[in-house]
């Protein structure tokens, strides 16, 4: 039979279950794109439809007669550009065929630097495709000539690589100015007009997983952003007045940007409906470019607007300040793991007044449990009177069954924000914490943190006052630590560390409040 207390308790149980299951299941379904079974290298042959620009050149012809990535061998590299931070290789088609970041965090298990140019996909950065099939075919047969085979970019300098290609009746010149951090400027000139597409490159395809968004985005001159997630592109589109476009995965991105003279951009799709971005022109083309990590400091040093590629989802308004605060703590602490611990403690302190109110209310409900049971028995045949007497009991003793839900509701956006920050922060990659945790961006190799997190959650349940009468609801609550432990096993250690410390704080707070409440209760009973 329904009554007010059961309804309140059911809402609290439902809220806890919804938070756990919706977060891990439905959130991933709606906000994380499905992974393609196989990555194709060709662009769709579909004609451009419903575009925002009527004079967009047809990309169909530009997708034919392009070389397979497998055909581009080491022998085809005509120039190498290096700095302290990166190495770029330019092939005979005038493209960046390989790009390496020279830092330990960008090494694979074999100790080799990761190539940010995906060899399984097309197009490569700075690859040009012409609308005229005959020009396009010839462009992938006649090699470019470079003015230098090796260039080194000083820490405060730049180097210009000049590439030239002479086709039948058409000369193509590419001037690429490289800067130390991996950003560059590209200028293309043709001896006569010819419609062509040029790409910043397919997304790096290095850090692609089921947890994060990957695909492409376009920002116009009003700073309105359109995101195209992998698997979601249904038709070819185009946009004008574009100041920045990027293809990205979890940690890495490739860009074209021009905040002074906006670009015209076409968004095509491959066989798996993944976005492929091209800028297009019929002669001169100028843009800034970047290949590298989505590290905030680097992106901000190039242009703060590039930070838009770091995706935080719906809770960006909370996540961005959270990251800035975490970064601030790291500057003083020098360790990302301990910065996460300190940030969690500070957040818990800020939320303590609400938590305290909730815990006191739960203790009051525990004391009222015998009286509540008596009311249910006395008025079990009259739900209206039962509810009325329950409300009078709550009012008399200052108890509010719904007050326990408010802190949880307020913590939902904070948790989602911290979740997105810790999941997307390249700064945590290869960043150690202490003991056995040598990389906060990957799962705990020994599952110690998830188990500790589950244990603290279980202990918290043991000392938290419960007034649940329904055995089924009680069983569901007991299984929550197991469910959370199971899901967190594969989560990055940084995120699991946050949740473990958060649980530890809750455990300590509950223990202290239980002691305080017990003393107050003892005083009242002694005085009586």
From Swiss-Prot:
Keywords: Cell inner membrane, Cell membrane, Chaperone, Membrane, Protein transport, Transmembrane, Transmembrane helix, Transport. The keyword Magnesium does not apply. GO terms for cellular component: plasma membrane. It holds the Pfam family 60KD_IMP. Its main location: membrane. Required for the insertion and/or proper folding and/or complex formation of integral membrane proteins into the membrane. Involved in integration of membrane proteins that insert both dependently and independently of the Sec translocase complex, as well as at least some lipoproteins. Aids folding of multispanning membrane proteins. The keyword Oxidoreductase does not apply. InterPro entries: Membr_insert_YidC (IPR019998), Membr_insert_YidC_N (IPR028053), YidC/ALB3/OXA1/COX18 (IPR001708), YidC/Oxa/ALB_C (IPR028055), YidC_ALB_C (IPR047196), YidC_periplasmic_sf (IPR038221). Interacts with the Sec translocase complex via SecD. Specifically interacts with transmembrane segments of nascent integral membrane proteins during membrane integration. NCBIfam families: PRK01318.2-4, yidC_nterm, yidC_oxa1_cterm. This is Membrane protein insertase YidC. Belongs to the OXA1/ALB3/YidC family. Type 1 subfamily. The chain crosses the membrane at residues 13-33, 336-356, 406-426, 446-466, 481-501. It is found in: Cell inner membrane. HAMAP family: YidC_type1 (MF_01810). One of its GO terms (biological process) is protein transport. One of its GO terms (molecular function) is membrane insertase activity.
């Amino acid at each position: 039979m329904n009554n007010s207390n059961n309804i309140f308790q059911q809402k609290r149980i439902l809220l806890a279950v919804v938070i756990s299951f919706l977060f891990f299941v439905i959130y991933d379904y709606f906000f994380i794109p499905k992974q393609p079974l196989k990555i194709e290298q060709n662009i769709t042959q579909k004609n451009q439809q419903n575009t925002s620009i009527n004079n967009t050149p047809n990309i169909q012809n530009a997708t034919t007669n392009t070389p397979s990535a497998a055909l581009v061998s080491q022998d085809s590299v005509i120039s190498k550009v290096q700095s302290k931070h990166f190495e770029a290789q330019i092939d005979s088609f005038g493209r960046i065929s390989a790009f390496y970041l020279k830092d330990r965090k960008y090494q694979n298990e074999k100790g080799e630097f990761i190539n940010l140019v995906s060899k399984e996909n097309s197009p490569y950065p700075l690859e040009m495709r012409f609308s005229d099939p005959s020009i396009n075919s010839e462009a992938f047969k006649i090699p470019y000539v470079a003015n230098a085979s090796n260039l080194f970019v000083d820490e405060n300098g730049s180097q210009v690589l000049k590439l030239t290609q002479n086709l039948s009746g058409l000369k193509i010149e590419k001037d690429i100015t490289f800067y130390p951090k991996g950003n560059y400027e590209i200028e293309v000139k043709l001896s006569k007009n010819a419609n062509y597409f040029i790409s910043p490159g397919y997304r790096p395809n290095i850090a692609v997983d089921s947890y994060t968004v990957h695909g492409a985005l376009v920002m116009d001159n009003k700073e309105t952003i359109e995101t195209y997630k992998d698997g979601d592109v249904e038709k070819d589109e185009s946009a004008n007045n574009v100041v920045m476009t990027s293809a990205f995965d979890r940690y890495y991105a490739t860009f074209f940007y021009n905040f002074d003279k906006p670009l015209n951009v076409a968004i095509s799709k491959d066989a798996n409906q993944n976005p492929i971005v091209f800028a297009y022109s019929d002669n001169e083309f100028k843009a800034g470019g970047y290949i590298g990590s989505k590290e905030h400091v680097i992106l901000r040093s190039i242009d703060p607007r590039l930070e838009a590629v770091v995706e935080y989802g719906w809770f960006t308004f909370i996540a961005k300040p959270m990251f800035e605060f975490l970064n601030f703590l790291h500057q003083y602490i020098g360790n990302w793991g301990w910065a996460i611990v300190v940030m969690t403690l500070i957040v818990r302190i800020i939320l303590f007044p609400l938590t305290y109110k909730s815990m006191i209310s739960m203790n009051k409900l525990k004391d009222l449990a015998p009286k509540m049971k008596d009311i249910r028995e006395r008025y079990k045949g009259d739900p209206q009177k039962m509810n009325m007497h329950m409300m009078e009991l709550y009012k008399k003793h200052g108890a509010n069954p719904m007050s326990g839900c408010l802190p949880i509701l307020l913590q939902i956006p904070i948790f989602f924000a911290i979740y997105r920050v810790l999941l997307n922060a390249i700064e945590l990659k290869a960043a150690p914490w202490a003991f056995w945790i040598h990389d906060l961006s990957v799962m705990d190799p020994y599952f110690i943190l998830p188990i500790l997190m589950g244990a603290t959650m279980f202990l918290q349940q043991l000392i938290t006052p419960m007034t649940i009468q329904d055995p089924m609801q009680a069983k569901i609550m007991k299984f929550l630590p197991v469910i959370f432990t199971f899901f967190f096993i594969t989560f990055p250690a940084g995120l699991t560390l946050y949740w473990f410390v958060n649980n530890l704080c809750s455990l300590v707070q509950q223990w202290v409040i239980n002691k305080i409440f017990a003393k107050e209760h003892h005083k009242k009973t002694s005085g009586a």
